[in-house]
Every structure is written in structure tokens, then in C-alpha cells.
UniProtKB/Swiss-Prot annotation:
One of its GO terms (biological process) is translation. GO terms for cellular component: cytosolic large ribosomal subunit. SUPFAM superfamilies: Ribosomal protein L32e. GO terms for molecular function: structural constituent of ribosome. Residues 39-77 are annotated as: Disordered. PROSITE patterns: RIBOSOMAL_L32E. Pfam families: Ribosomal_L32e. It comes from the Archaea. This is Large ribosomal subunit protein eL32.
């Protein structure tokens, strides 16, 4: 039941642009992640003196740069356009603006409290992203 929030035309355009940019963005992986199992894929900046990746040679993987970022106005928003608010109990729902924000129930919330949160959210007309 994910409805779209009240977004301006500009914000909708920027959300679509962000989606396109993310599709084109390469997956930034650690240098030589494929060579040694113990390294893992998580990004680490190459610091070696002779590192081809650090020197940005043509054939080597790309490194993260500010140019890969998403537009400032829609940065951090859920793909639906809502601003996510983490909720731990039903009382937290009262602080949410249903027009711009959506709730995400915290992972450590149990089944009973989760049910209470869902009922109260429906009552207040708040979207729950992980319902």
C-alpha cells in the first residue's frame, strides 16, 4: 500500500533522474577484491605507491567521486519519494507527517508491538514501508 507523497514536479523529476544515475553507476569494489578471498568487496581507497587504480588508469575500475552522487533535494529519500522514519513503538507514529514521511518498523521490534504499530499507522493514514 505505498502511495506517493505530495511531491512537486521538480522533486518527481529528480527522483527519476536519481534512478537513472544509480542504474549507470558502477559497483565500487576494493582493489583486487577478485584476487584474494579474504579482502571482500567492501570499498577501500587504494593507497599504494604504484597502484594503477589510484592513478586512475583507463582500464582499471572506477573510484567513488562526488560526480556519482544523487541530486541534493532527493538524497536519502525512499524510491517512492517518502522520507523514512524509524519507528520503535506506536507512540513514535504521532511525530510523523503522513504527507511527506513514511514509517519503517525497526528490526528489533517484536510481533505483538509490530501489530500494534501497523494498526495505529492504518488509523492515522501513515504508510509503513516494511509492513
Amino acid at each position: 500500500m505505498v502511495r506517493n507523497p505530495n511531491l512537486s514536479k521538480e522533486e518527481e523529476r529528480l527522483l527519476k533522474l536519481r534512478e537513472e544515475l544509480k542504474r549507470k553507476k558502477p559497483k565500487f569494489r576494493r582493489q583486487e577484491w577478485h584476487r584474494y578471498k579474504k579482502l571482500g568487496e567492501k570499498w577501500r581507497r587504494p593507497k599504494g605507491r604504484h597502484s594503477k587504480m589510484r592513478r586512475k588508469l583507463k582500464s582499471k575500475p572506477k573510484m567513488p567521486n562526488p560526480g556519482y552522487g544523487s541530486p541534493k533535494k532527493v538524497r536519502g529519500l525512499h524510491p517512492s519519494g517518502y522520507e523514512e522514519v524509524l519507528v520503535y513503538n506506536p507512540k513514535d507514529l504521532e511525530k510523523i507527517d503522513p504527507k511527506r514521511q513514511a514509517a519503517r518498523i525497526a528490526s528489533r521490534v517484536g510481533r505483538r508491538k509490530r501489530q500494534e504499530i501497523l494498526e495505529k499507522a492504518e488509523e492515522l493514514g501513515i504508510v509503513v514501508l516494511n509492513a
